[in-house]
């Protein structure tokens, strides 16, 4: 979406339910006078793992007809180096206390303190502890998946993958993957996985396996995987 920070010109923001806070780059923070207050620890996909970042406050954030004041934010300072693109801005509606509906087919985004219930083909119980998760199964084993509108694929953690038994053995295909904490040198593609979310099935599905130990440690529970655009864009 396009958003204005402190009344400045519009910039692109990723709507990111996989982020604990709204995030701005060092460049935008300096340009729009978002002052850092203190440092905190953040964690994401990538070999950096736990990462020290600044916390600041956006006086006003405008997205379409929505205007929010006094928005806590993470400032990506120091910035990551060695990744293909610069770190982008992202807006976390859940951290702002908002409900959100993303209609991928109609390309429509709805925010609100309360959003009326609508008929649904499938409902998944949602849990929120810093991030929002749903329960799923990986080869019939229970796992918690982060709902990440800012992510691209369906992935599972390396710890979850290590508990799966394969007969015969399945070849692992190395991948080049980076996230909010840099490159993940151990990422690989694992074919032949059976995923289930209530009645939503992904049989014999290739998943990306990521090192999620740092996010799990910071959150205080084992993150089993992440569901991103590949999953969510069907709805």
Can you say where each PLM-predicted feature lies in the sequence?
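Pepsin/retropepsin-fold aspartyl endopeptidases
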Residues: 1-235
């Amino acid at each position: 979406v396009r958003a204005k920070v402190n009344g400045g010109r519009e910039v692109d923001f990723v709507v990111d339910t996989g982020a604990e806070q709204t995030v701005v780059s060092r460049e935008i923070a300096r340009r729009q006078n978002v002052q850092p207050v203190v440092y905190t620890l953040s964690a994401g996909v990538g070999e950096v793992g736990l990462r020290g970042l600044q916390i600041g406050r956006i006086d006003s954030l405008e997205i379409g007809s929505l205007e929010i004041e006094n928005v806590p934010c993470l400032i990506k300072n120091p910035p990551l180096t060695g990744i293909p693109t610069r770190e982008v801005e992202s807006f976390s509606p859940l951290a702002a206390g908002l409900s959100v509906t993303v209609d991928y087919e109609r390309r429509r985004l709805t925010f609100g303190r309360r959003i009326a219930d609508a008929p649904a083909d499938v409902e998944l119980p949602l849990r929120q502890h810093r991030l929002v998760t749903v329960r799923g199964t990986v080869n019939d084993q229970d796992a918690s998946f982060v709902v990440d509108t800012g992510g691209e694929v369906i992935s599972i953690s390396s710890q979850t993958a290590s508990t799966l038994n394969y007969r015969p053995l399945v070849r692992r295909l190395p991948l080049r993957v980076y996230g909010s904490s840099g490159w993940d040198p151990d990422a690989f593609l694992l074919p032949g996985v059976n995923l289930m979310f209530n009645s939503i099935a992904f049989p014999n599905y290739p998943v990306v396996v990521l090192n999620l130990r740092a996010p799990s440690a910071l959150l205080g529970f084992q993150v089993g995987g992440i569901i991103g655009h590949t999953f969510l864009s069907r709805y």
